[in-house]
Amino acid sequence: MSTHDPISDLITRIRNAQMRSKTKVSTPGSRMRENVLEVLKSEGYIRGYATVEHSSGRSEIEIELKYFDGEPVIREIERVSKPGRRVYASVKNLPRVNNGLGISVLSTPKGIMADHSARDANVGGEVLFTVF
């Protein structure tokens, strides 16, 4: 199935799986999704992920979700920049999520990274989504 917005699809799959207390969820594979998942893993929002190659040539990413005391670690995950309305931020205007308790994930010229990494690298970019 073709999707017009792979980031929104990924976010929705994660949110829906956590509402149903699933331990794993799968999504079609792509480099962009892997980069986003790498940021979520390094920030401690997911346990991990693995790419699975099928005999048909398609790849799929299996995401292992993270829970703490039976509650999902991700309380809120919300898309900011959408295909119809892109949202960009310079280093000075990078949003803080819940007073710094959450993160914004950005697509920058130096790759996909969390907001604090973008501040350290002194780059701005497209604000893909926020996580708390």
Swiss-Prot record:
One of its GO terms (cellular component) is cytosolic small ribosomal subunit. GO terms for biological process: translation. Keywords: Ribonucleoprotein, Ribosomal protein, RNA-binding, rRNA-binding. It comes from the Bacteria. The keyword Phosphoprotein does not apply. Transmembrane segments: none annotated. InterPro entries: Ribosomal_uS8, Ribosomal_uS8_CS, Ribosomal_uS8_sf. GO terms for molecular function: rRNA binding; structural constituent of ribosome. Belongs to the universal ribosomal protein uS8 family. One of the primary rRNA binding proteins, it binds directly to 16S rRNA central domain where it helps coordinate assembly of the platform of the 30S subunit. This is Small ribosomal subunit protein uS8.
